[in-house]
Amino acid sequence: MFGPAARFPYDPKAAYIPADAPFEVLQKLHGRLGIERAVIVHASCHGADMRVTLDAIARSGGRYRGTAIIDESYGDLEFKKMHDGGIRGVRFNFVRHLGGPPEMGFFNRTVERVQAMGWHLILHLDAADLVEFDALFRKIRVPMVIDHMGRVKAADGLQQKPFQVLLEWMKQDNFWVKICGAERVSSKGPPFTDAVPFGRALVEAAPERVLWGTDWPHPNVKWMPDDGALVDLFPLMVPEPALQQRILVENPESLYGFQGR
């Protein structure tokens, strides 16, 4: 979600300032798509000001959880407030267009904090980062969710080094992946079906640690997707009804603490 800026101002240091895409619009989208529960990924354009995400979770009547972006000012009180407000993870943007990798001392301290909270990390990476930070991430034992299928490029094929690294990560029981962002993985554009084999391969690797999401409202994309069309890609990646139930319902219940956890 973005804004509205009049109530939830954007970070003046943000890499991008989007048009408002507030809670009310998200509600309409979820109603149209038939989505009952969701995880709000706090947007980098709001910086470490978590008010917009905490407000949405509070207004959701228990249907939403969220992930955070933090800075060095966050201590015990802030983490307790976020946990009580439905936050269950901290996201780091390694991608260069959003500022690049974090300061490693801060990153390592946050890993320790996340472990103590029983949360997880969300890693937003470019394909090259999967190779560059391979050794670092393999040493971390807290749960880690890799966003957007690692932002690999479909044109480079399933055998490309970054995707093979991602598949190796999925052999460790603390790595998770989101099979979202087909519009970012695709090299051909709509309907983004060239991203489907990547999602399918990840599901085959570890269906018990795969998540799905819309990635709405799709900032910084070359092709603005239709959200209904993105939903239609899901059964192409996951044709089995039992695995659909697992990925859409059971996996997020486990990781994000729905139903009171």
Question: Model-flagged regions — what are they?
Answer:
Residues A48-Y64, V196-A206, D227-L236:
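Short, electropositive alpha-helical surface patch
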Residues E103-W212, G260:
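Catalytic pocket-lining loop regions of alpha/beta-barrel enzymes
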Residues M1, G31, G105-F106, T110, ...:
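A generic "structured core" feature
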Residues M1-A48:
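An N-terminally biased module of ancient metal coordination in phosphate/nucleic-acid-related enzymes
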Residues I17-R37, A201, P207-R209, K222-R261:
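Mid-to-C-terminal alpha-helical segments outside catalytic/metal-binding sites
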Residues M1, A43, M149, T214-W216:
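Active-site metal-binding loops of divalent metal-dependent hydrolases
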Residues H30, T53, M82, V90, ...:
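Conserved, mostly hydrophobic/aromatic
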Residues C45-A128, A135-R138, W176-A182:
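Active-site gating/metal-coordination segments in enzymes
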